[in-house]
């Protein structure tokens, strides 16, 4: 028993353990001291190793670890290393996720609904789509049941499909005439006239002969700042013509300001007339007043009396014979 007893003095000259390979198993204080010394020595070695040597050491240590120790390492790595692709809807509260989705346009919400089932349930909430429908005064003519989900989204899609999109109408042939290019008298036949000069001369002659006649629309060159790549949300985009005029007005001040105001006023009046004509055309068409949209299930109205209810139940059972199930009945004995 005396051979395994702990030594009386630890700091003596015989108890220096820095250069020894002895591991005290029965003395906890000496064991902790040896462990700290060897851990510091291992850290110095690890600092001097190359990257490949460090990888080999880490791989060997992970292979020696048990399952619980490997899970511990995994948790530590997740705390130290930030996640590259983290679903914010799983970490943030549901209210904040819905608030973030409320800033998206309808097309982006439809794309978000294709990510996962949870995103689909968030992107089809009535709290998001109801505001987008009420923005254009699109209401539903019924009160949905608590089990109907995504009613306002379907209503928005249906109303967008029913929008009256008018195609651009080509002007009649009588309004525009082709340019009749003729040589100006007085020039020698040998001289060649440029096409632009000939077009200007013919247009000036046509103006003098027919002052009330309309001209051909001017040819528009390619846009230096193309807008074709801009996302096409046609319900949210502003009028490009008004935006262009406002930008030009801010950038430069033209001397003929009255003429620009008059042209702008005429354009606005033309748009108002066009909208009025479109509304008259829509009013002349037969109105469609759906009592209820097509997607909700129509439940049969409960009849008032008992006989009508029995007849409706019998008709329903005849249409669906698989629903009939024999049920035992108790016969009362007289």
From Swiss-Prot:
Low complexity: bias regions: 194-204, 323-334
InterPro entries per the UniProt record, alphabetical: F-box-like_dom_sf, F-box_dom, GEF_Ubiquitin-Prot_Reg
Ranges of Basic and acidic residues composition bias in the record: 210-222
Stretches the record annotates as Disordered: 168-222, 314-334
Disulfide bonds: none
Boundaries of every F-box domain copy: 86-132
Keywords on record: Ubl conjugation pathway
Organism superkingdom: Eukaryota
Positions in coiled-coil regions: none
Protein purpose: Probably recognizes and binds to some phosphorylated proteins and promotes their ubiquitination and degradation.
Subunit structure as annotated in this protein's UniProt entry: Part of a SCF (SKP1-cullin-F-box) protein ligase complex.
Name of the molecule in the record: F-box only protein 16
Source organism of this protein record: Mus musculus
């Amino acid at each position: 028993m005396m051979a395994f007893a702990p030594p009386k003095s630890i700091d003596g000259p015989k108890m220096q353990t820095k250069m020894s390979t002895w591991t005290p198993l029965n003395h906890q204080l000496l064991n902790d001291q040896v462990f700290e010394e060897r851990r510091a020595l291992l850290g110095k070695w690890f600092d001097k190793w190359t990257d490949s040597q460090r990888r080999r050491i880490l791989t060997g240590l992970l292979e020696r670890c048990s399952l619980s120790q490997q899970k511990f390492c995994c948790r530590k790595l997740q705390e130290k290393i930030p996640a590259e692709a983290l679903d914010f809807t799983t970490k943030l509260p549901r209210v904040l996720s819905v608030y973030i989705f409320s800033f998206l346009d309808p097309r982006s919400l439809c794309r978000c609904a294709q990510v996962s089932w949870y995103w689909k349930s968030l992107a089809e909430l009535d709290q998001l789509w109801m505001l987008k429908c009420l923005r254009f005064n699109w209401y539903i003519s019924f009160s949905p049941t608590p089990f109907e989900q995504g009613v306002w989204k379907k209503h928005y899609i249906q109303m967008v499909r029913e929008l009256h999109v008018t195609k651009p109408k080509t002007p009649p042939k009588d309004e525009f005439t082709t340019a009749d290019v003729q040589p100006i008298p007085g020039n020698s036949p040998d001289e060649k006239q440029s096409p632009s000069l000939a077009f200007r001369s013919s247009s000036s002659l046509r103006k003098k002969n027919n002052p009330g006649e309309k001209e051909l629309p001017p040819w528009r060159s390619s846009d230096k700042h193309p807008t074709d790549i801009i996302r096409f949300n046609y319900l949210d985009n502003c009028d490009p013509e008004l935006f262009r005029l406002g930008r030009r007005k801010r950038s430069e001040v033209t001397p003929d300001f009255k003429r620009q105001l008059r042209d702008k006023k005429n354009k606005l009046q033309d748009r108002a007339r066009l909208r009025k004509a479109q509304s008259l055309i829509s009013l002349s068409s037969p109105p469609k007043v759906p009592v209820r949209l097509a997607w909700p299930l129509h439940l049969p109205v409960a009849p008032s009396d008992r006989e009508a209810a029995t007849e409706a139940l019998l008709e329903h059972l005849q249409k669906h014979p698989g629903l009939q199930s024999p049920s035992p009945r108790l016969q009362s004995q007289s």
